């Protein structure tokens, strides 16, 4: 396979304008050699410190594959340690996930960063290392039986890291350095778990080109699920090491990139901290990363011996940027879709309790269901398709097939309600699942929800009606990024009176609250 290096250069030149923000880095490795390396903008606008290829940036959730790689390289067979998972979930009432299911995001557990919102956290408050395990230990149920579906969950990897450190008797930073950073030549990479103290004093920025940029104030401690800081030079060395060890079936990357599957045998799209997807017509493994003020993405196409890395110190889409580099280098053009017609609307999934919303534009559809919106194009057969998702209609029912999640949803139409009286649902509610409360206040047509729990009393969030007895709670900023976004809140009635609520988002579904 030959790369169009001129087209790649043009695509790299376009990144600062297409993905506007304070700064960023991007690089490409082909056949084990660095063929492109760029750094633009500033690591700190106020101090005028330029962004450089040696500037260390948080790679955030890209760290998950490093955790899984060290796990396999030190402990080997994960099944030998499955019994230890129970130590971290003492109140769990269903089948417990295995260690492998944690690594593959098939545990069915709710994401603990999403749950920090429901436990009363404010986006910028300090979240210490010792705050995580008590929150996880409160879990009593999950989304689904382990191994049957996919759900992104950061606490999976926090549990993995705790078991890994306990079994080896060694700190995770030392294991990273010994097993991956050293062999890969990642000379400056390190675990920087405390986000209040970023490596090289790099500043991440919230905001946008429309409203301006302001420094993100992060206060979380994460380990196992994220926390590594690395420069572009470090990350390109990692990609070169992957290529150099490609023929060794016992190499770390070969082992973590084996095709994953669900317990039923159906192929899965995520395993050992790696996403398996198709980008620009290529099968790739990789991962994204996010913290307020930062975005990162890496892709590796093993058959083509091609890798791409993009990291921003702002919140533009690193996934889209990295995808554009692959497309340019390969001369790939995405197929044009037919004009959509009659797909717009909203539906409610009775199983997850989540709202599905579909919007139309000239180029396709935007589906809002999971953490971020999915873009779909309508094929010649009239079927809207996107990355790992497609839509169909059975009468008024909307059928969503999320093959990457091993999930089929049959959602019923939800009539639109623009104005509703929140006075009926105002009051205090308690969730046994979380051992936490939800307070709703209504005044002069406005409605707001506040969460109280293990981490305090959080800010009041906006509450908007969307359908009969269905509301959305809007969370645009949280400890982790991206924020949960819109939570679907359903009213539960007994004899016509409000008895409780069911709240959920893609990362934390089906949480029941009883009226106090």
From Swiss-Prot:
An example of a Pfam family matching this protein is DAP_B
Please provide the Gene Ontology terms (biological process) for this protein. Answer: proteolysis
List the InterPro entries hit by this protein, alphabetically.
Bact_CellWall_Synth/Modif (IPR050491), Beta-lactam-related (IPR001466), Beta-lactam/transpept-like (IPR012338), D_amino_pept/lipop_sf (IPR027279), DAP (IPR023645), DAP_B_dom (IPR012856)
Activity regulation (UniProt): Inhibited by beta-lactam compounds such as 6-aminopenicillic acid, 7-aminocephalosporanic acid, benzylpenicillin and ampicillin. Inhibited by p-chloromercuribenzoate.
Molecular functions (GO terms): aminopeptidase activity
Q: Where is this region: Important for specificity?
A: 476-486
As its record notes, the protein acts as a catalyst of: Release of an N-terminal D-amino acid from a peptide, Xaa-|-Yaa-, in which Xaa is preferably D-Ala, D-Ser or D-Thr. D-amino acid amides and methyl esters also are hydrolyzed, as is glycine amide
Keyword set for this entry? Answer: Aminopeptidase, Hydrolase, Protease
Protein's UniProt keywords contain Transcription = no
The broad enzyme category this protein falls into is hydrolase
Q: Where is the active site?
A: 61 (nucleophile), 64 (proton donor/acceptor)
EC numbers: 3.4.11.19
Report residues binding substrate.
Answer: 480
Give the UniProt family note: Belongs to the peptidase S12 family.
State whether it acts alone or in a complex, and with which partners, per the record. Homodimer.
Purpose: Hydrolyzes N-terminal residues in D-amino acid-containing peptides.
Q: What is this protein called?
A: D-aminopeptidase
Specify the species: Cereibacter sphaeroides (strain ATCC 17029 / ATH 2.4.9)
Question: Species lineage, top-down?
Answer: Bacteria, Pseudomonadati, Pseudomonadota, Alphaproteobacteria, Rhodobacterales
């Amino acid at each position: 396979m030959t790369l169009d290096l001129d087209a790649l250069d043009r695509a790299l030149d376009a990144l600062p304008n297409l993905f506007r923000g304070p700064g960023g880095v991007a690089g490409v490795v082909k056949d084990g050699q660095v063929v492109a390396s760029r750094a633009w903008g500033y690591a700190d606008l106020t101090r005028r410190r330029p962004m450089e290829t040696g500037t260390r940036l948080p790679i955030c959730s890209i760290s998950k594959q490093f955790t899984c790689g060290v796990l396999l390289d030190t402990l080997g067979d994960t099944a030998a340690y499955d019994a230890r998972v129970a130590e971290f979930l003492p109140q769990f009432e269903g089948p417990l996930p295995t260690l492998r299911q944690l690594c593959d995001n098939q545990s069915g557990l709710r994401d603990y960063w999403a749950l920090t919102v429901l436990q009363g956290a404010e986006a910028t408050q300090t979240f210490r290392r010792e705050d995580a395990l008590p929150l996880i230990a409160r879990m009593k149920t999950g989304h689904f039986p382990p191994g049957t579906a996919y759900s992104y969950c950061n606490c999976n990897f926090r549990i993995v890291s705790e078991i890994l450190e306990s079994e080896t008797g060694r700190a995770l930073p030392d294991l990273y350095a010994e097993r991956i950073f050293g062999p890969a030549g990642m000379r400056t990479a390190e675990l920087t778990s405390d986000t209040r103290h970023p490596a090289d004093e790099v500043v991440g920025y919230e905001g946008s080109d429309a409203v301006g940029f302001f420094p993100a104030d992060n206060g979380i401690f994460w380990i196992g699920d994220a926390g590594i800081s690395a420069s572009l030079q470090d990350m390109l060395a990692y990609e070169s090491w992957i290529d150099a060890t490609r023929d060794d079936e016992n190499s770390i990357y070969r082992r973590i990139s084996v095709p994953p599957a669900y317990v039923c045998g159906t192929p899965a799209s995520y395993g050992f901290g790696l996403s398996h997807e198709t980008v620009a017509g290529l099968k790739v493994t990789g991962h994204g990363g996010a913290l307020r003020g930062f975005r990162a993405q890496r892709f590796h196409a093993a058959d083509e011996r091609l890798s791409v890395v993009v990291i921003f110190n702002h919140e533009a889409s690193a996934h889209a940027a990295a995808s554009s580099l692959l497309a340019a280098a390969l001369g790939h053009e995405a197929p044009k879709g037919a004009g959509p017609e009659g797909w717009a609307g909203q539906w409610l999934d009775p199983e997850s309790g989540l709202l599905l919303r579909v919007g139309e534009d000239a180029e396709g559809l935007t589906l809002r269901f999971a953490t971020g919106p999915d873009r779909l194009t309508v094929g010649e057969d009239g079927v809207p398709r996107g990355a790992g998702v497609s839509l169909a209609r059975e009468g008024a029912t909307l059928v969503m097939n999320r093959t990457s999640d091993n999930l089929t949803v049959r959602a019923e139409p939800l009539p639109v309600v623009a104005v509703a009286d929140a006075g009926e649902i105002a009051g205090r509610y308690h969730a046994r699942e979380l051992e936490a409360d939800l307070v709703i206040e209504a005044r002069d047509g406005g409605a707001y929800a506040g969460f109280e729990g293990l981490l305090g009393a959080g800010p009041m969030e906006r509450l908007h009606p969307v359908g009969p007895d269905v509301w959305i709670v809007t969370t645009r900023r949280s400890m982790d990024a991206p924020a949960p976004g819109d939570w679907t809140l359903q009213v539960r009635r007994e004899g016509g009176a409000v008895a409780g609520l069911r709240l959920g988002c893609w990362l934390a579904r089906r949480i029941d609250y009883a009226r106090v």
